[in-house]
A protein has these predicted regions:
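Short, glycine/charged-enriched secondary-structure capping and boundary segments
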Residues: 42, 65, 273-275
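Short, aromatic/basic amphipathic alpha-helical patches
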Residues: 247, 268-282
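Consensus positions within tandem repeat domains that build extended binding/scaffold surfaces
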Residues: 16-17, 37-40, 60-63, 83-86, ...
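Structural signature of tandem-repeat unit edges
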Residues: 1-12, 21-35, 45-58, 68-81, ...
């Protein structure tokens, strides 16, 4: 029996197809649809709930952007990609359960979802785009599964209520400004394969009190921990080879203890040309069991 080919109209929801829906509408996308096109529901302020079919593979860029009354989105296993700004500025959305089939979350995907307090990420996600969850003011905790190898810059910037983060063990980089401005952040479970902490990665995380960098961490970027005003202790492994600028700890007024796992000579090599801008005059750096210098 010959297989019937489907028309593009049978596979894709295009912009404008649901414009005549009533206020507080609940839309069920029919089975067979494989893609929701770019801008398909953008700015549909009457939309309150969307149920997506198992056949859906892709939610395209800005598909639901600016749906300010959207409270619930039901995604099904089979979805593979959620592209750039797909749900940005959906300010009434409170929780999202991303199915385990999703491998990519695009740039700004849930940016400025101000009411979003709970997010369950796909256990298969490989990449989270820049700014994906930035300005999600009510998000309190996040676990990035071990399938993920890349979280791009600004991904969780200015999530003011974020208190705890568990990062994928397979992330080698915490990118620029990933958690910048997360002023409630108290706990970070860092990746065991971490190599570099990027510029401003934790800048302004004013509730962060203690950081233990894992073995293998070799680079701390400019302003990485700047203005972490509660940070009192940081433990640095012997693998460290570069602090891009010691403004990495600028404005860390409570910092009194920097523990370094390597030799005194190696620390002095790392510090050559850097100026410690920690204000506390009693801040000390120690190698195992030996306090070897006072930094003023």
């Amino acid at each position: 029996m010959e297989k019937k080919e489907k028309n593009i109209e049978e596979l894709v929801v295009f912009s404008g197809q649901y414009e005549d829906c009533a206020d507080n509408a609940r839309i069920v996308i029919p089975d067979g649809i494989e893609e929701i096109a770019e801008n398909a529901f953008r700015g549909f302020t009457y939309l309150s709930e969307v149920v997506l079919p198992r056949s859906l593979k892709r939610i395209s860029a800005c598909a639901f952007a600016g749906c300010s009354n959207l409270k619930r989105i039901e995604m099904q296993f089979g979805l593979e990609e959620i592209l750039d700004e797909a749900f940005s500025s959906c300010s009434s959305l409170t929780s999202v359960n991303i199915p385990d089939s999703v491998k990519r979350i695009g740039e700004g995907c849930f940016e400025a979802c101000a009411s979003l307090s709970q997010i369950k990420l796909s256990e298969s996600v490989v990449m989270i785009g820049s700014g994906a969850f930035a300005y999600c003011f009510n998000l309190t905790d996040v676990t990035i599964p071990d399938s993920c190898v890349l979280v791009e810059f600004n991904a969780f910037a200015n999530c003011f209520s974020l208190e705890g983060v568990k990062l994928s063990c397979n992330m080698g980089l915490i990118d620029e400004s990933t958690f910048e401005g997360c002023r409630s952040l108290k706990y970070v479970d860092l990746p065991t394969k971490l190599v570099k902490i990027g510029r401003r990665a934790f800048k302004g995380c004013s509730s962060l009190a203690n950081i233990i960098l894992p073995v293998g961490t070799s680079v701390i970027g400019f302003d990485a921990f700047a203005d972490c005003s509660s940070l009192s202790r940081i433990a640095i492994p012997k693998d460290l080879r570069e602090i891009e600028d010691f403004d990495a700890f600028g404005g860390c007024d409570a910092l009194t203890d920097i523990s370094f796992g390597g030799s005194r000579e190696k620390w002095e090599d790392i510090m050559r040309g850097n100026i410690l801008t920690v204000q506390k005059s009693d801040c000390s750096v120690s190698v195992p069991k030996i306090i070897f210098m006072n930094l003023e």
